[in-house]
Amino acid sequence: IASCLVGSEMCIRDRFLNKSDIEYCVIGNGSNLLVSDKGIRGVVIQLSDTFDEVEYIDDVTVKVMSGMMLSRLGNKLADKGLAGFEFATGIPGSVGGAVRMNAGAYGGEIKDIIVSADVLDRSGRLISLSRDELELDYRTSCIAAMDYIVVSAVFRLQKGDTDTIKALIKELAVKRRAKQPLEYPSAGSTFKRPQGFFAAKLIEDAGLKGVSVGGAMVSEKHSGFVVNTGNATAKDVCMLTDMVKDKVKQQSGVDLELEVIKLGDFS
């Protein structure tokens, strides 16, 4: 794993993009990833927590480097009395990953607050994309399809009261702990929400709550999560998610789609 310790796109471009013989992939915090048991071929570039400068453009607009953790950014914004980011503060990911997948929770999504993002293409060209050009939709954007690397994002928020903002952040954190299986390691929400349905409800109705393969288990606390109860392999997780998808399809006719992103050789 290579970390970019300099908060600049030049770090990525000079060390990797200009060297065509190097295979690489870029990750943020890795919180929604499932890595193959065979590992990943080539270099994994992690946009570390030093790649996390914040620039205050005006009273309600900020530019943030992609390595910034959402929790850290949320608390910084709260201290400044900026509201609108509370929904994301408890998501265990980075700004880059959040933009890539249009992360969301508790009624909010990145597309609600983003103005633009600077990205690198595979040739090392820096491109600025507007909110519309990012093609943000439910847990997706053009970033993955075009294989872009998020360098930074601009968010527009609203002025608010610091104490009120922090109280909401705390309230959402309490809800998250009550509803999600945070006592076990996981890659977060495992399946995307099918249109008109809730994945967890479909999985529970199919009788799959608590079902396990090896060390991987459908959480008994929230069926939308596959958790690692101890020494689970990526193969265990894949076998279990395939079983879940098959049984839900048989039971309800709904096709579940993974929200977790697979990296590496799963052949």
Features from the language model and the residues they span:
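Phosphate/pyrophosphate- and phosphate-bearing ligand-binding catalytic cores of soluble enzymes
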Residues: 33, 120-247, 251-267
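FAD-binding glycine-rich core of flavoenzymes that anchor FAD
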Residues: 9, 19-24, 49-96, 120
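A gly/ser-rich beta-alpha-beta helix-loop segment of oxidoreductase catalytic cores
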Residues: 78-115, 186
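Structural signature of FAD isoalloxazine-binding scaffolds in flavoprotein oxidoreductases
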Residues: 34-52, 100-131, 145-152
